[in-house]
Amino acid sequence: KDAPPMPSILGYDVVGEVIEAGSEAGNHLVGKRVVAMTRFGGYAEQAKTDYRACAIIPSDWDATMACALATQYCTAYYAAYECVQLHNGFQVLIHAAAGGVGTALIQLAKHKGCYIYGTYGSDDKKEYLLNQGVDIPINYRKVDYQKEFFNLSEGKRLDVAFNSVGGTTFKNDVSLLDKGGKSVIYGAAERSGKKGGIFSTLNLAWNFGLMTPIQLLMNSQGVIGINMLRIADYKPLVLQHCLQDLVKLTEQGVL
């Protein structure tokens, strides 16, 4: 139900100059160059969004680079800095680490001094992950990442798992968590591109597995789900904070 009615102009991420504000609350943005998130409609010459979904950026920033701060980096920031508290030395697993959100998570986690395991699916991505700061890249197509983690972690368990794949990987991640560990899930790529309609969706749900709150309670663990559309709709000030802090971190050279 999150899909827009057809015909529709797609696009979540925009960069440009604010030419008009619909209320006095957004007047301070008029004439400013901003990065913003939209509820679709971004692939157009002009776009409309909530003034709280904008952050002012330097006039000399590359538009393509700045656009990445919207959906991809906002998702990563919300996952890594709002939903959990990363600490120096934390053992962190990032699925699909070479993707947009994965890259952002690497940079944010490395900034906090975390030790990072990152999964990837093609050999050409390994060098990229090492350059980004991943300590242990794991090719999930060649090895069982769950077993590989246990082989390489020297008895340590995960403090945080960031998962955009879902399904069976979610169950595996939970089994890797340390006491006090958290699993943060923000996607279900295991379902993407598969035919079968409702049956594929039910299979995905089955693969996620079942767990009881008492299991989490006894181990002081947590499972956190993220849908940035819900944050944009119901917590726009949180979204604004994420965007503004991402701009600061970029200016500081962290990202």
What are these regions (language model features)?
Residues 3-7, 12-13, 33-96, 137:
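NAD(P)H dinucleotide-binding glycine-rich loop of Rossmann-like/cofactor-binding domains
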Residues 144-156:
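Short amphipathic alpha-helix with an adjacent loop that forms part of the alpha/beta core around
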Residues 33, 91, 115, 181-182, ...:
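Short glycine-centered segments of the SAM/dcSAM-binding site in methyltransferase folds
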Residues 168-252:
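Glycine-rich phosphate-binding loop and adjacent beta-alpha segment
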Residues 29, 69-143, 147:
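Mid-domain Rossmann-like dinucleotide-binding core that forms the NAD(H)/NADP(H) cofactor-binding site
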Residues 15-39:
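A glycine-/small-residue-rich N-terminal strand-loop-strand element
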Residues 82-86, 153-154, 175:
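Glycine-rich helix-loop-beta junction characteristic of Rossmann-like nucleotide cofactor-binding loops
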Residues 42-45, 121-128, 210:
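Short, glycine/polar-rich helix-capping loops at beta-to-alpha or helix-loop-helix junctions
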